[in-house]
Amino acid sequence: MKQTVYIASPESQQIHVWNLNHEGVLTLTQVVDVPGQVQPMVVSPDKRYLYVGVRPEFRVLAYRIAPDDGALTFAAESALPGSPTHISTDHHGQFVFVGSYNAGNVSVTRLEDGLPVGVVDVVEGLDGCHSANISPDNRTLWVPALKQDRICLFTVSDDGHLVAQEPAEVTTVEGAGPRHMVFHPNEQYAYCVNELNSSVDVWELKDPHGNIECVQTLDMMPENFSDTRWAADIHITPDGRHLYACDRTASLITVFSVSEDGSVLSKEGFQPTETQQRGFNVDHSGKYLIAAGQKSHHISVYEIVGEQGLLHEKGRYAVGQGPMWVVVNAH
């Protein structure tokens, strides 16, 4: 398995393309100059395209991925109804979902042969919309509205329209600020990192289209932490055993172990990392974690080790200015 790591740096308007080998070593293979401040990125389900959101001219760009080395070639673009904060796709590669924090909306862009061709639906009134996350069964879109302390739930129709489910939302504790999410591989649990109180909620999907319950909330910060809380990102290993979340103020990654059924998280430790770590990701083997420092302009690679899933630094690399997004593609 070959793996390519893509790093989005909006301040220098670049995507750095790296090869990740089996020993956790990165080799720079390409630097792409992007026509705008590039932030969120996602790889298409068939691994043929990288979709990126840019500002200040709000667009989604599609880059064709070379199958041999992961190199990028521009392919197409489509306008968006707001500044892109988060980007994702459905599991069949039919639609791109874009959450916009500033516009307070989530949009659906249709794909034809992998290329974006236009927005087919927009839902407004999502104050602080910070991500759009498709459920494992490809039916429900989870959309955290950070400023409203709620996660809105939409059914995705065959033509890409979003229909509010019943119930139409789940709510967090007041002032939590739900932000980013991941799903357990067993499809029975979802995990949401809350930006404003730096906590992680565990949601049990008893019925993913209606009966959803928060079964655990864990503080992700050290006991003696007294500064402003400012959580950012969350990811889980492919085997579902280890979960990670980061806080930008502390420049810290919190390490969690996950119970066998996915229902319980346990804090295992803390890893100091790049300054104001905004984004990170786990590779497809579950052996490495790559973290980007928005203020350090560097990325670090960590090996995931032991039963606890603790992080051991393997290497550190300079990238563009203000790196914010990390995507790993296996090919």
Curated annotation (Swiss-Prot):
Top-level EC class: hydrolase
One Pfam annotation, family name? Lactonase
**Record's GO cellular component terms:** cytosol
The record's annotation in InterPro entries points to: 6-phosphogluconolactonase_YbhE, Cycloisomerase_2, Lactonase_7-beta_prop, N2O_reductase_N, WD40/YVTN_repeat-like_dom_sf
Q: Which residues carry this modification: N6-acetyllysine?
A: 287
Keywords of the record? Acetylation, Carbohydrate metabolism, Glucose metabolism, Hydrolase
Q: Which reaction does it catalyse?
A: 6-phospho-D-glucono-1,5-lactone + H2O = 6-phospho-D-gluconate + H(+)
EC number in record: 3.1.1.31
| Domain of life of the native organism | Bacteria
UniProt-listed GO biological process terms: glucose metabolic process; pentose-phosphate shunt, oxidative branch
Disulfide bond positions: none
- Secreted recorded as keyword: no
Pathway(s) where this gene product acts: Carbohydrate degradation; pentose phosphate pathway; D-ribulose 5-phosphate from D-glucose 6-phosphate (oxidative stage): step 2/3
Q: Per its record, what are the GO molecular function terms? A: 6-phosphogluconolactonase activity
NCBIfam families, per this entry? PRK11028.1
The record's family statement is: Belongs to the cycloisomerase 2 family.
Q: What does this protein do?
A: Catalyzes the hydrolysis of 6-phosphogluconolactone to 6-phosphogluconate.
Its recorded name reads: 6-phosphogluconolactonase
Supply the source organism for this entry: Escherichia coli O7:K1 (strain IAI39 / ExPEC)
